Amino acid sequence: IYLRSDISDITGLKQVLSRISSEIEVTYIKEEKVIAKVLYPEYSEVYDEIAPAHIFGRNIEGEGFRARQCFDGGKADMNQYDTIFPKASAEESVKVAGKIALYRLMYPYMLGSSSEVLYMDYLKNNKNEIIGSCIYDKNIDEIKFMLEKFSGDRNMIERAIVVANETGFGEAAALILKYRRKKEDIRKSRYAF
């Protein structure tokens, strides 16, 4: 979903999201510039009949339901959204939790310092899989962000080059090689005589 509004504006997004249980990305655009991206993970709900009284129990799986409740008066409440991450990082796949962390760090609207540390730690601990996922999805801005944050990690860089070559994503391979060369040039210049 693309919204031409600021993330702090009142929108009807909560009502739209309440009708969609599959994973959905919301991109906020203002003046032709992406100002925020928010991932709402998939969730499922099942009603179990408790017989014979015909009482139903509601079971919800996935953090997507809780994420869709993070609104305050029609505005996205990102502080509340940040509270779902500890459970989401344990229950959701690395790809999904990685996107949540990546988007919150790339677009830090209302991002508290403790949440920033939590998201950064998650990226650091799962960086190879997350950058691989970004390459498979051909998300160049996210690849750039990961390279800027972890350009000193040779293992991640080498792994990213392999994944970019395997997927045939030449733009990513060129970008990663550029970051690697820049890092090597910095090392060489330190020891030049």
Please name every model-derived segment.
Residues 7-9, 152-153, 167:
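Short acidic, S/G/P-rich loop/turn micro-motifs used as interaction or catalytic elements
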Residues 1-138, 144-147:
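Solvent-exposed loop and capping/linker segments of extracellular ligand-binding repeat ectodomains
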Residues 14-17, 161, 173, 177:
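Short amphipathic alpha-helical segments and helix-helix/interface helices
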Residues 133-139, 163-169:
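Ankyrin repeat A-helix N-terminal signature
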Residues 138, 142-150, 155-162:
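C-terminal structured domain segments
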Residues 139-147, 169-181:
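Ankyrin repeat structural motif
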Residues 110-127, 150-159, 171, 180-193:
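Ankyrin repeat arrays, specifically the small/polar loop and inter-repeat linker segments at the C-terminal end
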